[in-house]
Amino acid sequence: ALEQRCIDPRFTYVKRGCAPYVEWLGIQENPSGAGWAAGKGYGNKILDILSNILETGEREEDMNIIKMLAKKNCYPGQNKPAYVVIHETDNWSRGADAKAHATAMKNGNLAGTVHYYVDSGSIYQTLDHKDGAWAVGDGGGRYGITNRNSINIEICVNPESDYYKAVDKAEQLAASLLKQYGWGTDRLKRHYDASRKHCPRRIQDEGLWPEFKRKTAAYMGTAPEKPT
């Protein structure tokens, strides 16, 4: 019997009929015989994927979410999510994309923090959902949405990013989060709803919020709640 079945190069999958299902995890063709053999990192990859599913309820590759989790400028372990809140960065500098903001946040260089940054090409997760962001505290909890009961998504507006594609990715992400928690679009809010701040600015200025909620509901496969 093989002692390390997950990494032994002699372990083939063809006999078990499951090669098509494990190939994408890093399986390599077995040079010493017919079939497929697990590479060295196979076991760890399985554990990483299972860990992510347990933590977020989503396979990361489905949303192409890149994790760059910060532990600064937040409320560790104090968030009990009840809302998904949409923001915009208001940062029009070239290069101010999702990765740049995520890096700055991880390094502790941003006073305001969120759980996700989205641009037209990528999504970065920057806080665990159980950690509260410094995102809507300016509302002082007057409207029921706080830093300790919300998941916050920031849409990047840098000029080289396609803004409307970024908005679409944010709609998909919001839909995924709402489905994960079993919520309807009545739990989808703007920063404005939490504090009356004019944010997300461009969505507000262009009157896009009803469409944002409609498309989010469509991605969820449901009808939108009453617009707010």
Question: Model segments located where?
Answer:
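Basic/polar, cationic surfaces and motifs that engage anionic cell-wall
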Residues: 25-71, 76-78, 148, 156-228
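Alpha-helical segment that forms one wall of the substrate-binding/catalytic cleft
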Residues: 1-16, 164-178
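Surface-exposed intrinsically disordered loops and tails
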Residues: 10-33
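Active-site-adjacent loop/helix surface patches within enzyme catalytic domains
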Residues: 61-184
